[in-house]
UniProtKB/Swiss-Prot annotation:
This is Serine/threonine-protein phosphatase 2A activator 2. It comes from Aspergillus fumigatus (strain ATCC MYA-4609 / CBS 101355 / FGSC A1100 / Af293) (Neosartorya fumigata). PANTHER family: SERINE/THREONINE-PROTEIN PHOSPHATASE 2A REGULATORY SUBUNIT B, SERINE_THREONINE-PROTEIN PHOSPHATASE 2A ACTIVATOR 2. Pfam families: PTPA. It is found in: Cytoplasm. Its EC number is 5.2.1.8.
Amino acid sequence: MMPSHATMSSPPAGTKLDLSKKLSELRASRRSHSGPSPREPTPVTPPLPSPPDLSTHTYTRPVRRILSRKDHETFLASSTYTLVVSFTFSLSDSVRGRAVTDNKDQPASPNISRILSVIDTIRQLVDKHPSIDQGGSRFGNPAFRDLFDDVAAQNATWHREIIGLQNADAIEEVSSYLVHSLGSRDRLDYGSGHELNFMMWLLCLRQMQMISTADFPMIVFRVYLEYMRLMRQVQMTYYLEPAGSHGVWGLDDYHFLPFLFGAAQLVDHPYITPLAIHNTAVLDEEGDKYIYLDQVRWVDSVKTVKGLRWHSPMLDDISGAKNWLKIEGGMKKMFIKEVLGKLPIMQHFLFGSLLPADPSMGERSDDAQEDDLHDHGNGNPHARHTDHFGDCCGIKVPSTVAAGAEMRKRIGGTGLRPIPFD
């Protein structure tokens, strides 16, 4: 029997919907279906193996080897996976309980200075390749391809003349990770996979004994922060689209590591609690010392809507955690599950001689066509055509950085940002 209109669940005329309640229900639903379970133990940092003996080493050009779900599962059980986790977590552990300013008077080692010089050289190239006027478009600016090509053209020279590598094959292998840390030339996007490429560039240099464990705090506080600032400049200049964005339900449209490194810094802090991210005064006073606070400050500054509750509900939810140790553990779980554990991200991971693939993993016969065939982890690989719709076949997602920048252009200055439903 069809229900009568009297028994339908539609609200009576004039009844005001409680949208905040709906949002809370949606949050609870999303939390129950995504993210690591709080009952999962915090991942431990695997021992970092000593760098290999490279005296008779043969270098190879990095290629993609994760072509299927089986390849991904093989990677997750491999020594390279353990090395990546160990290196990343060791960096995070090296800054636990330390402020960025703790190292401000410490001189950088010669190799750290060389790495910083390369990042600064790329920053200067951004100024030489201004964005193309797209009439207010918030999608990726094609001028990024000019920057990418310029970096690719000079990359080998930098590794020879600045970094100090002399072996041509070693330069080809190591430099591949740096150029692919800027974003996708084809898709005009940037995400945690590109950020991971930057860390793999550093890991390769560590495997070549150009970075020591003693350098790890400086890697986070100087090298990584300079890279992140470079990428903010790139995002503001070229409006790169967020690769594989989760929208408001993601931690951040572009970066993950600021939250891992930043949470480690704040473990056992005497007065900055997780809820402090809602206090503008704390962000302004402490943001230059703590990466987590700086990233929250940045995210809030580029959004068109005011308030973490509306534009970053995941960060808002995390702020309710008991302490920073809980958040640090959660970030380690997320790195394993949401970065290394995601096939759409890891199918772009590059394997060479320093970060070797398991011999059983797939191989492409034509590396030039790597972007044309991809898999979502459902066993159905398919082609991506020239008129693709962003990363992994979702609809194209405009740059959130661009949205804020274009709004400020229209209204002038920073302006007041609207609160949803207000």
